[in-house]
Amino acid sequence: MKTMRGLRNCSNDAVTLDLTVHPPPPPPLPPPAPSTVSSSTASTSLSFDEEETSESKIGRLISEHPVIIFTRFSSCCMCHVMKKLLSTVGVHPTVIEIDDGEIAYLAVEAAPVLFIGGTCVGGFESLVALHLSGQLIPRLVEVGALWA
C-alpha cells in the first residue's frame, strides 16, 4: 500500500459505506400564525396576545407551566445543562427565550432562570443545590410535573 510522504498508515481496517437509499425528508411545516409561538419542549403551544405586555406574558407563562426556564439564548450551555438535568429525572421544561429588557420582569439579574410551580428557583447553581439536597423530585411531584 502506498503512503504519502511523511504520513504513514495507522490502520489496516476496512471502511464500510452504507449506500442505502433513504426516502426524502418530509416537506417543511408551514410557519406558525403571527401571534403564536411554539415551543419544542412544551406539550402545548404558547400563544401571545399581541397587545399583552411583556410583564403579563411572563407572569401568565409562569402560572401556566409547572416547570419553565427563561433564557437569553436557547443554545446557552447552562440552559442546556438545566434541561438535561430535568429530563434525566423525567421532566421536560418549557424554555422561553427573552431579551435583555424582559429580564427585569423576572426580578433576577441573570438568565437562565428556572421556575417550578410558579416559584423562582434561580439559576443553574440553585437547581443543582435543590437536586443534591433531595428536594427537587418531591417539589416536581408536588407541582404535578412528575408522577411519584
Curated annotation (Swiss-Prot):
InterPro entries reported for this sequence: GlrX-like_pln_2, Glutaredoxin, Thioredoxin-like_sf
GO cellular component: cytoplasm
Keywords in alphabetical order: Cytoplasm, Disulfide bond, Electron transport, Redox-active center, Transport
Primary location class: cytoplasm
Ranges where the Glutaredoxin domain occurs: 55-147
Location(s) in or outside the cell: Cytoplasm
Role noted for this protein: Has a glutathione-disulfide oxidoreductase activity in the presence of NADPH and glutathione reductase. Reduces low molecular weight disulfides and proteins.
Name of the protein described by the UniProt record: Glutaredoxin-C10
Source species: Arabidopsis thaliana
Gene this chain is encoded by: GRXC10
